[in-house]
């Protein structure tokens, strides 16, 4: 009976996926029905006649993963359990202990603490390894760790953690505090206001509005809105933030799709808080989605000068769709477009090279015009008016973080040399050299198509005992290692900043990172200089 249910579920699920993934053929119902019938028969014949016993659910999961891999990474399937866990996390009754954790070397490690939250007050420290939650052991194979940690506000959770090979169990109250979207705002020298926005969570626009009101009361004559490292969030919050600086009924962003019902326009609905304060928006390669909507709209409307590095380029819109048995698919339904008509999406997942890599949209970037007639370009995210970025072949920064090289090095440094004063803190070149040496001594991938193909060639050559091929691949591998060294030198400043931020966060929380940036940061200093020269500021917007 169970097997029949599994098979029925598998067929229904596959049918729905086929309909969804054949979106460009929605009017060709015969073709859709034909493909569903073929898949149904294929799936049935395999499960009924294959020489070995098959697992319908596993076969279906493999098929689903392969199908979705042909689309984009944002179109994802969620099982019934995944959906229920997500609902629980979004519930107002579900709160945590105020810490970020991730598995490092198969150990659940505390990577960040929120100031004043229960984990922080209870003595947990960055780098501690969590072994048990309410007596349940956790390891790299554990799923739903956040569900174990979370619960109703003020409920108690028992945590067993290890520090310096010493195990300790403590009880923490789930306090429900959430990190602010605006961790810092301040009036700087020369009456320049500064607002850091880390996410577009619910209420983010109210936090920005409140900060702006304080700064205007203090007679701020210019404003820096820092969206660096902001991954995005709720679209309406982005629209409401832009509304603080532009008139009512102004188009901020639109979505366009092959399906008419997904074509929408988002316009401002309120009177602005400040129409004329000189405004600068800071972005970098980790500013994405809603961050790019804010930066792009203010740039298109010539309301702000954008400074920093080219943004991430995430301009795709997703919407969840229910599936049978409580499952769900979050599917890309449309693209974001800024007021000038440009799309900020960097990668075109419908266009792939022969090697299988995704082509960049900016290869065919079109020119668009701002309100004042300035040239701006579509594809590849938001290009700053003042570009402080360095041209790089690889996303080395992302790779260093992904492999936990930055966190592990910063933790070791923090334990040996705890930062006591932000004003006196500065990493020397010797620290960079040691970090580079440590990283290069480890085997890590630049995640290029070339490297992936070389690895496959090396493995195949070993299996077939082709010594000459193995030697040739080794030569290519040496060349790639030299490329890594070149990238380290090229990105030295960015890497030192990244290490500094991680070390400071361990001593002074996320708020300290922004405090330190105000002391000596290239992007902020560039913004302050520009706001001190309003003639040049105005010229950049013409």
Explain the meaning of each model-derived region.
Residues 50-111, 154-184, 518-525, 536-542:
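Extended, small/polar residue-biased N-terminal targeting/export presequences
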Residues 10-24:
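Hydrophobic membrane-insertion alpha-helices, especially the h-region
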Residues 290, 302, 309, 313-374, ...:
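Polar, glycine-rich mid-to-C-terminal structural blocks
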Residues 343-344, 348-349, 354-542:
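Conserved functional hotspot residues or short segments at active or partner-binding sites
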Residues 1-5:
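N-terminal secretory signal peptides that target proteins for export/translocation
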Residues 112, 141, 171, 332, ...:
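Short linear motifs in exposed loops
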């Amino acid at each position: 009976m169970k097997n029949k249910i599994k098979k029925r579920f598998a067929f229904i699920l596959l049918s729905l996926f086929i309909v969804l993934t054949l979106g460009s053929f929605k009017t060709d119902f015969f073709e859709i029905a034909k493909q569903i019938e073929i898949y149904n028969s294929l799936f049935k014949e395999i499960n009924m006649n294959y020489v070995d016993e098959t697992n319908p659910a596993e076969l279906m999961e493999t098929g689903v993963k392969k199908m979705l891999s042909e689309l984009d990474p944002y179109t994802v399937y969620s099982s019934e359990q995944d959906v229920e866990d997500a609902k629980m996390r979004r519930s107002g009754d579900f709160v945590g202990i105020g810490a970020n954790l991730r598995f490092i070397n198969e150990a659940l490690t505390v990577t960040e603490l929120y100031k004043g939250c229960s984990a922080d007050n209870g003595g947990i420290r960055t780098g501690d390894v969590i072994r048990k939650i309410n007596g349940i052991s956790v390891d790299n194979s554990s799923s739903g760790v956040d569900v174990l940690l979370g619960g109703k506000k003020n409920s108690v959770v028992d945590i067993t953690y290890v520090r310096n090979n010493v195990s300790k169990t403590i009880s923490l109250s789930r306090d429900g505090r959430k990190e602010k979207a605006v961790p810092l705002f301040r009036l700087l020298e020369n009456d320049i206001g500064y607002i850091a926005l880390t996410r577009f969570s619910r209420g983010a626009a109210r936090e920005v509005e409140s900060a702006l009101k304080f700064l205007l009361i203090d007679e701020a004559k210019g404003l820096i809105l820092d969206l660096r490292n902001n991954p995005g969030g709720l679209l309406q919050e982005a629209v409401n933030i832009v509304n603080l600086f532009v008139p009512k009924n102004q188009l901020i962003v639109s979505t366009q799709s092959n399906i008419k019902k997904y074509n929408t326009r988002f316009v401002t609905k309120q009177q602005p808080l400040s129409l004329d304060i000189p405004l600068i928006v800071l972005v970098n390669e980790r500013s994405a989605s809603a961050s790019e909507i804010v930066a792009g709209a203010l740039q298109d409307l010539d309301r702000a000068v954008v400074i920093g590095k080219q943004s991430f380029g995430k301009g795709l819109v997703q919407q969840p769709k229910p599936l049978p048995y409580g499952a769900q698919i979050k599917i890309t339904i449309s693209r974001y477009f800024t007021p000038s008509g440009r799309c900020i999406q960097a990668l075109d997942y419908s266009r792939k090279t022969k090697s299988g890599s995704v082509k960049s949209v900016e290869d065919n970037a079109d020119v668009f015009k701002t309100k004042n007639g300035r040239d701006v370009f579509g594809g590849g995210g938001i290009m700053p008016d003042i570009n402080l970025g360095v041209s790089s072949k690889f996303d080395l920064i992302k790779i260093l973080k992904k492999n936990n090289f930055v966190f592990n090095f910063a933790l070791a440094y923090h334990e040996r040399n705890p930062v006591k004063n932000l004003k006196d803190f500065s990493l020397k070149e010797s620290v960079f050299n040691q970090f580079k040496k440590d990283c290069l001594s480890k085997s890590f991938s630049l995640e290029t198509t070339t490297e992936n193909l070389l690895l496959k060639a090396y493995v195949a050559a070993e299996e077939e005992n082709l010594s000459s091929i193995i030697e040739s691949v080794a030569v290519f591998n040496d060349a790639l290692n030299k490329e890594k060294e070149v990238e380290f030198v090229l990105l030295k400043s960015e890497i030192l900043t990244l290490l500094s931020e991680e070390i400071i966060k361990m001593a002074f929380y996320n708020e300290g990172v922004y405090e330190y940036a105000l002391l000596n940061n290239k992007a902020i200093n560039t913004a302050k200089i520009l706001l001190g020269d309003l003639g040049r500021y105005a010229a950049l917007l013409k």
